[in-house]
Amino acid sequence: HPLGNPPHLRMESLARTSTYVRAYVAVVVLLAAASIVLLFTMSPSGVTPETVSILGLLAFIGLGFGLQLAELKLVVGTVHSSISFIIYIGSGLVFGPAWAALITALSVGGAQLVGRKPVIKAIFNVAQHVVAIVASGVAYLALGGPLPPQPIDEAVLPFMAFLLVFFAVNSVAVSGVVAISEGRPFKDVWI
């Protein structure tokens, strides 16, 4: 065909890509949901519903929501990211990964809803943020990071792991969905 693939083949490719994107999003959502359930069941942070500060939770949720909604961006090269990650990381250090996951989900989800993002994009954004904050919070705790954090000289390695894992998981999750949706190799879109 002189203009590339015939229209029916392009539509088949688009439908296949869409199916792959939905499957990828479903896996990320399942991972996020399972991690929240496991963390609240195990309560590794020691911050229990009886000891958590409701006012503190609401403050972190409000700040995360506001920054996410304001779309204040951190730009590095061609990559644009909301600065709301600062709030999510802070909530992980104060409340632990279970509560940080809840704060992150409510903040990102609320902003996606108010911003009228497409449903699949909104669901993915919530889930990938939750997976990133859970993985990074668990890495922090596994390396002996205290909650809430003590003087930084006692928690440098756990804190660095928290940051590196958060950005790595976030980058891999977003790059994965972009690679699938655009039909490009992961290495070409990894940010």
List each language-model region with its residue ranges.
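Short helix-perturbing small/polar motifs within transmembrane alpha-helices
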Residues: 2-80, 86-191
